[in-house]
């Protein structure tokens, strides 16, 4: 995780000799997420602001002087709320201040007690654009019809698009030769689609082949299931294998009594099925619960998902040892796991949740080792729509993340004409960003 969160440079705090203002910042009683950290919010001069001094309580180091600098420390990131009672007041505003944030002008106010507050909107403006959520989970397949049959016949997903990418587009974005056929499937709940893609050039390998559960990259996709035992019988009868048979437990993170199992779909794609004790639907499956990514540590995930993609870390805690070891692939070991969740803006609808797993055992990047890449069977990318691809790529570059493909224009059925590129994100894992033309 980068040490510098943001800096009010030497041009900072050039006071605008404004007349003293009587209004004091008033607590809203609400918590905001600023680059993965919860902070109490206040209203001041019609703006939502955060107090500079409060940041030190959440892992920030604050230096006051002719230049106000705020950096993030190595303090453990948690999802505990920031304390603030609605209606509480800070000291009165002394003057409006002109400051710079990442080289851009922002609104700040100095207070009578020497503290300062910064407009939250300005802080987010120089954060990343808050991306909505996962639009596409891109899954390589050795047999498109077999993969399509699995998700349509067994999981009752709907085909919403079918098409072929020309050889030039495939070469530019994926680095593969020849055309590629694809099918997009989704349920009636989530806005996230699965994009099943079969390249003309195939390796015969799968993305997770030869790797451990704790190696970095895409882990699985989890679904809420109506009858796990019935699905276990159905899929084993169809020739599919399981990482673990159905078992029951009570989650330590939500308190729900559930049953769970993990099936290996076409090309070995792990498909987790979760059954709550009370159901609210009659179909085989309901929503796509989450898409899981393994990282080297939670700070790396925050650096990518929050600092670059603008998303909020809303949960971060250890998983009770032994509770779901068989699902996590660590049964019989002393390996422990930390789990986190990220939310986007969900402007595109109910996008699936992003779940992060941080194992105590060091791993390797499946992408950098040639596993989770185009041409192999399995999940190799997630795609996110952005309103400004240029700005997003500049932010990736600023945080040390490089493009992993040519930038190209293509048309995807159900999506439209897009400007798109692959980026090597956290631990080298591939992400596809695109902007509608």
Language-model region placement:
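Primary recognition of N-terminal secretory signal peptides and signal-anchoring hydrophobic helices
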Residues: 2-8, 21-125
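Intrinsically disordered, low-complexity segments enriched in Gly and acidic/Ser/Thr residues
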Residues: 305, 355-408
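Acidic helix-start/capping segments at beta-turn-to-alpha-helix junctions
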Residues: 65-75, 162-169, 318-321
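An N-terminus-focused feature that recognizes amino-terminal "leader" regions
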Residues: 128-141, 145-154, 158-198, 212, ...
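Vicinal oxygen chelate
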Residues: 115, 124-130, 162, 222-223, ...
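Amphipathic alpha-helical segments
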Residues: 49-59, 145-158, 231-237, 297-313, ...
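Short, charged/polar, Gly/Pro-enriched secondary-structure boundary elements
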Residues: 57, 74-80, 125, 192, ...
């Amino acid at each position: 995780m980068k040490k510098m969160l943001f800096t009010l440079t030497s041009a900072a705090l050039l006071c605008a000799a404004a007349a003293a203002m009587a209004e004091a910042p008033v607590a809203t009683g609400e918590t905001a997420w600023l680059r993965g950290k919860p902070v109490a919010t206040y209203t001041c001069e019609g703006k939502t602001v955060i107090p500079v001094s409060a940041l030190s309580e959440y892992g920030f180091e604050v230096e006051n002087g002719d230049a106000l600098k705020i950096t993030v420390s190595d303090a453990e990131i948690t999802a505990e709320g920031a304390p603030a009672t609605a209606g509480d007041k800070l000291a009165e505003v002394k003057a409006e201040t002109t400051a710079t944030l990442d080289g851009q002008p922002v609104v700040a106010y100095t207070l009578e007690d020497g503290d300062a507050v910064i407009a939250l909107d300005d802080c987010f403006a120089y954060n990343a654009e808050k991306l909505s959520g996962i639009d596409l989970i891109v899954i390589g397949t050795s047999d498109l019809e077999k993969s399509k049959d699995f998700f349509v016949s067994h999981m009752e997903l709907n085909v919403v698009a079918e098409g072929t990418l020309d050889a030039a587009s495939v070469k530019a974005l994926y680095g593969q030769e020849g055309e590629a056929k694809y099918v997009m499937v989704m349920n009636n709940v989530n806005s996230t689609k699965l994009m099943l893609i079969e390249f003309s050039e195939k390796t015969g390998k799968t993305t997770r082949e030869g790797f451990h559960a704790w190696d970095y990259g895409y882990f699985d996709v989890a679904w809420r299931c109506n009858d796990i035992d019935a699905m276990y019988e159905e899929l084993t009868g169809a020739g599919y294998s399981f990482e673990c048979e159905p078992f029951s437990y009570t989650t330590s993170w939500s308190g729900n009594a559930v049953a769970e199992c993990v099936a290996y779909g076409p090309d070995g794609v792990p498909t987790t099925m979760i059954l709550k004790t009370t159901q609210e639907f009659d179909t085989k499956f309901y929503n796509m619960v989450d898409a899981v990514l393994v990282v080297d540590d939670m700070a790396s995930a925050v650096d990518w998902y929050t600092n670059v993609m603008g998303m909020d870390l809303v949960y971060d805690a250890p998983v009770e040892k032994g509770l779901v070891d068989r699902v996590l692939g660590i049964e019989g070991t002393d390996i422990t796991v930390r789990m986190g969740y990220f939310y986007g803006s969900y402007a595109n609808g109910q996008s699936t949740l992003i779940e992060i797993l941080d194992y105590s055992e060091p791993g390797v990047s499946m992408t950098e080792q040639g596993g989770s890449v185009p041409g192999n069977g399995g999940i190799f990318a997630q795609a996110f729509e952005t309103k400004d691809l240029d700005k997003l790529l500049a932010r990736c570059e600023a945080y040390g993340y490089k493009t992993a493909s040519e930038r190209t224009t293509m048309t995807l059925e159900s999506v439209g004409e897009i400007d798109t590129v692959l980026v090597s994100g956290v631990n080298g894992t591939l992400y596809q960003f695109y902007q509608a033309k």
